[in-house]
Regions:
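Hydrophobic alpha-helical transmembrane segments of multi-pass membrane transport/permease proteins
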Residues: 11-39, 53-69, 158-170, 207-215
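A structural motif at transmembrane helix-loop-helix junctions in multipass membrane proteins
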Residues: 133-170
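Short hydrophobic, aromatic-rich alpha-helical segments embedded in or entering the lipid bilayer
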Residues: 1-6, 174-205
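Cytoplasmic membrane-interface segments at the C-terminal ends of transmembrane helices
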Residues: 5-12, 36, 69-91, 120, ...
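Membrane-interface helix termini and inter-helical loops of multi-pass transporters
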Residues: 37-48, 120, 189, 193-198
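Hydrophobic alpha-helical transmembrane segments of multi-pass membrane transport proteins
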Residues: 34, 48-86, 90-118
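Alpha-helical transmembrane segments of multi-pass membrane transporters/translocases
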Residues: 21, 65-66, 130, 189-231
Length: 231
């Protein structure tokens, strides 16, 4: 059994983890879509009801994945240091942790997409599924970077939540003019288009793929650098 599989099984053995990964996205989608629609009108956005449900699925997977990435990296400092000193090496430790976290965040994204599909139906299901997974992996990267650099649990979790809230209310559909620096800007655009029955442009797909890859590579690099310093 490789280390990534071992790390994943370690988390999945805890029943509460699976409950969070599945129940939170479902609850968020069924309760928050209307709230997002109302906030959009207040902020000058133009988020339709079905698009709001799609965006809620993305944000549900993003919130869980950001939290997962943060606590997976911040709580494993001691164990990762021992693994590095035992000869595993910081690069392989980082690879295993990131892959395990990607598996868990994908489970959360799948639960969010399934809840979205059951609640509203999706005009472009594959587009929505890819965008929800992109949300999850983007915020997994955010959580891992913060968890690798910030040791305090309170400070780190507040940073992740602050980034999340800022991104929610400044992104496409929510604000009259989406902020160009919004982390999930392209993922939100794809989800809104899928929920509204529109086709996503090839340029948006390329941007979404590139942004997601950059987030994961950055998470890997920062985690490996942090593990190397600890060893």
């Amino acid at each position: 059994m490789n280390r990534a599989t071992a790390f994943t099984r370690e988390q999945l053995r805890m029943p509460f983890t699976m409950i969070l990964l599945v129940a939170v996205p479902v609850a968020f989608i069924f309760s928050a879509a209307g709230v997002l629609h109302d906030f959009s009108k207040v902020l000058g956005g133009s988020l339709a009801a079905d698009a709001a449900s799609g965006l809620a699925a993305g944000w549900a997977s993003a919130f869980l994945s950001g939290s997962l990435g943060y606590f997976a990296s911040s709580s494993s400092h001691g164990a990762d240091r021992r693994l590095s000193l035992a000869g595993v090496g910081p690069t392989r430790v980082a690879h295993s942790r990131i892959v395990a976290s990607m598996v868990l965040s994908t489970i959360a994204a799948f639960a969010a997409f399934l809840a979205l599909w059951l609640r509203t139906g999706v005009a472009h299901p594959w587009h929505s599924a890819v965008a929800v997974i992109a949300f999850a992996w983007l915020y997994l990267g955010v959580g891992v970077v913060v968890g690798s650099l910030v040791s305090g649990a309170l400070e780190g979790s507040l940073i992740v939540v602050f980034v999340f809230i800022l991104d929610v209310f400044s992104g496409p559909g929510m604000a009259a003019a989406p902020a160009p620096w919004a982390i999930s800007r392209t993922a939100s655009t794809v989800l809104i288009a899928a929920g509204s029955g529109r086709v996503t442009s090839p340029a948006d797909w390329v941007t979404l793929g590139a942004t997601t890859v950059v987030a994961l590579v950055m998470a890997f690099a920062v985690f490996a650098f942090s593990a190397r310093r600890r060893s």
